[in-house]
């Protein structure tokens, strides 16, 4: 008996591992609601706490990379909604959950319902792109399902009036918040389908909390939108608000104003497009007419060019050109011959000796004249220099000094007598006067004082 069961015997490690795998594979990720107790946060940054209700509790861990996304600080005794994976801590065999996200219990329950309905409808194919209806372009009538007193309706009408004032708008007023709102929204959708007045529907409201927007997360509303034959544009809340209606609708707009922009044409832009098209059409017509006109003119000219009179005129013109060319050629030949004759005559005249003799005689006459002028200039210059020298010599000549009453005496040996010591009594000296010489004997010598 024992031997037949040995193949089913688990070790403790294998048992814990098997149980962990079963928990993780079979349970997967779940939402758990409970009260926090024994909350701790060691230096690692992970959270460890116990989640309990009136009759049971379970150990929980939330690692740092997950708890950093939690927007509040968990408190002891706080009711929370936790999205977690079920697992087993193998070394101790402790069953525990690993939390991935955490929300306060009130809003968290709504989020849980939202996720569950989203998964359900997605599995049924309500979000598939193949079911989306294209929006009409352009829309001829717009239906609006929203509160008749809300800001969303005001924004939608304001945009439609600005962009396309002539576009008809039908309002299906409903509550957009509260217990009665989902039913009213469904009836408004069904009424719009039954009446068939509009070719596109805007369903939406202004922003708010998850609870405020909950009517658009209602399954009845989602299925009514899906079954609707009229294309639907959802416009719920702000751009960050995403509802089930957004997934089911044929197109999601981030805001009610944006939805109005999507379903309407901008008449000013349309007018600009028409004007631009008119301009392009006018330019195309002008180009076409100009092109045809050019083509007609070309054909007309070609026909004219084939006319016999025109061909005869062209031949006459060609003949006249030939006559002119022959005349020009003859004139050119005569001119060339004349020029050659002139060049020959010029060369012959250059070889005649008579012009060369005339040029040589003229050259000799020029040289004689220049030589005579040079001699005259040199003689005049020499006379002037000689006169200057005579004047200078006369100014320094001893004769000029004698003429003024002075005399010059010399000794018998011809030396000029300058001092008395050169002579003595009884010496003969010669004295030069202006008009002659005289000899005299020195009687006595008296030194000057």
Curated annotation (Swiss-Prot):
It catalyses: Exonucleolytic cleavage in either 5'- to 3'- or 3'- to 5'-direction to yield nucleoside 5'-phosphates. Signal peptide: none annotated. Keywords: Cytoplasm, Exonuclease, Hydrolase, Nuclease. This is Exodeoxyribonuclease 7 large subunit. It is found in: Cytoplasm. InterPro entries: Exonuc_VII_L, Exonuc_VII_lsu_C, OB-fold_nuc-bd_dom. One of its GO terms (biological process) is DNA catabolic process. Its main location: cytoplasm. Its EC number is 3.1.11.6. Pfam families: Exonuc_VII_L (PF02601), tRNA_anti_2 (PF13742). One of its GO terms (molecular function) is exodeoxyribonuclease VII activity. Heterooligomer composed of large and small subunits. Bidirectionally degrades single-stranded DNA into large acid-insoluble oligonucleotides, which are then degraded further into small acid-soluble oligonucleotides. GO terms for cellular component: cytoplasm; exodeoxyribonuclease VII complex. The gene is xseA. Belongs to the XseA family.
């Amino acid at each position: 008996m024992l031997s037949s069961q040995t193949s089913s015997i688990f070790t403790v490690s294998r048992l814990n591992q098997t149980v962990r795998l079963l928990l993780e594979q079979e349970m997967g990720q779940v939402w758990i609601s409970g009260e926090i107790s024994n909350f701790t946060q060691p230096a690692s940054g992970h959270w460890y706490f116990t989640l309990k209700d009136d009759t049971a509790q379970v150990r929980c861990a939330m690692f740092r990379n997950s708890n950093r996304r939690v927007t509040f600080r968990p408190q002891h005794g706080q009711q929370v909604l936790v999205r977690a994976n079920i697992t087993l801590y193998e070394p101790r065999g402790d069953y525990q959950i690993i939390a991935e996200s955490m929300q306060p219990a009130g809003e968290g329950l709504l989020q849980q319902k939202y996720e569950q309905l989203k998964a359900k409808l997605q599995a049924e194919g309500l979000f598939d792109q193949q079911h989306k209806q294209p929006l009409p372009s352009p829309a001829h009538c717009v239906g609006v399902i929203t509160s008749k007193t809300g800001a969303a309706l005001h924004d939608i009408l304001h945009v439609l009036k600005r962009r396309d004032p002539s576009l008809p708008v039908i309002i299906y007023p409903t509550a957009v918040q509260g217990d009665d709102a989902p039913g009213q929204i469904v009836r408004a959708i069904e009424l719009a389908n039954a009446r068939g007045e509009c070719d596109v529907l805007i369903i939406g409201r202004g922003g708010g909390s998850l609870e405020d927007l909950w009517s658009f997360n209602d399954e009845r509303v989602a299925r009514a939108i899906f079954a609707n034959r009229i294309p639907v544009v959802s416009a719920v809340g702000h751009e960050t608000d995403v509802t089930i209606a957004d997934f089911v609708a044929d197109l999601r707009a981030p805001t009610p104003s944006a939805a109005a922009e999507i379903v309407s044409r901008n008449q000013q832009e349309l007018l600009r497009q028409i004007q631009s098209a008119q301009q392009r059409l006018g330019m195309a017509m002008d180009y076409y007419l100009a092109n045809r006109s050019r083509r007609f003119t070309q054909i007309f000219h070609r026909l004219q060019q084939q006319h016999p009179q025109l061909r005869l005129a062209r031949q006459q013109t060609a003949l006249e050109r030939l006559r002119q060319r022959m005349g020009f050629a003859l004139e050119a030949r005569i001119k060339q011959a004349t020029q050659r004759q002139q060049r020959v005559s010029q060369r012959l005249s250059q070889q005649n000796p008579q012009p060369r003799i005339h040029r040589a005689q003229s050259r000799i006459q020029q040289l004689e004249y220049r030589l005579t002028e040079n001699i005259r200039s040199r003689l005049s210059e020499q006379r002037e220099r000689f006169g200057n020298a005579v004047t200078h010599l006369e100014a320094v000549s001893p004769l000029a000094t004698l003429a003024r009453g002075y005399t010059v005496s010399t000794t018998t040996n011809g030396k000029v007598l300058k001092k008395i010591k050169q002579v003595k009594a009884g010496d003969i000296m010669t004295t030069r006067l202006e008009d002659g010489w005289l000899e005299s004997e020195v009687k006595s010598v008296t030194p000057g004082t």
